[in-house]
């Protein structure tokens, strides 16, 4: 699914907020690459090409897979099922769409990807261009939340969520949530 990158003020706002000299990662989905390119085009020094050796596409950061439902609107899905609800809608944290993932599956995948990226880049700022579900899962890791609690977060497109990894004397060991869903302007 392509990304609408026409609102240049949004990307200029992101370019002002995000750290310089950071490691860049995206998911393997095209819209994250387009978003990253738009941020660089708006003035944040960044890698070229995206994805490329300096902007890694990490499949583990992809959005939750909805399997056979991928790309369908809610109305299309409801119509295709004759108005009947699939059990996924009653317990989306643990149930899977046909051929897809549960939110718990997503959390496990995203947690592995975050540890992989963090371990390879310890001490560096990381800009991760990701998806709403991926960000909810990252917040779950940072806050030690159950999957159901993560689904309570709303993530707007192009918002900034900042997580800092902390460790050391008097700091503990883990994650600090600095901001969630901050508008880019």
Describe these PLM feature segments.
Residues 1-48:
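Active-site-proximal alpha-helix that buttresses catalytic centers in soluble enzyme cores
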Residues 2, 41-112:
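Phosphate-handling substructures
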Residues 21-28, 54-57, 125-129:
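Short glycine-rich phosphate-binding loop at a beta-alpha junction
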Residues 29-33, 82, 132-133, 157:
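Alpha-helix N-cap/helix-start capping motif
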Residues 38, 137-141:
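Active-site signature of alpha/beta-hydrolase-fold catalytic machinery across serine-
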Residues 64-76, 119-124, 140-185:
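Acidic, low-complexity terminal tails and accessory targeting/binding regions
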Residues 106-132:
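GST-like fold's C-terminal all-alpha helical module
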Residues 132-136, 162:
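GST superfamily/GST-like fold recognition
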């Amino acid at each position: 699914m392509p990304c609408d990158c026409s609102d240049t003020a949004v990307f200029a706002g992101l370019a002002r907020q995000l750290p310089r000299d950071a490691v860049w990662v995206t998911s393997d989905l095209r819209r994250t690459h387009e978003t990253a390119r738009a941020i660089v085009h708006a003035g944040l020094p960044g890698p070229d090409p995206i994805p490329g050796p300096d902007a890694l596409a990490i499949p583990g950061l992809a959005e939750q897979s909805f399997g056979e439902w991928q790309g369908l609107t809610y109305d299309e899905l409801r119509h295709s099922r004759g108005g009947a609800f699939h059990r996924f809608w009653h317990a989306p944290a643990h149930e899977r769409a046909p051929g897809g993932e549960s939110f718990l599956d997503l959390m496990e995948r995203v947690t592995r990807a975050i540890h992989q990226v963090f371990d390879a880049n310890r001490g560096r700022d990381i800009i991760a261009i990701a998806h709403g579900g991926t960000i909810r899962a990252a917040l779950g890791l940072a806050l030690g939340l159950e999957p159901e609690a993560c689904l309570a977060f709303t993530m707007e497109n192009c918002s900034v969520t900042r997580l800092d990894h902390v460790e050391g004397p008097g700091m503990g060991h883990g994650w600090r949530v600095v901001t969630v869903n901050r508008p880019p302007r």
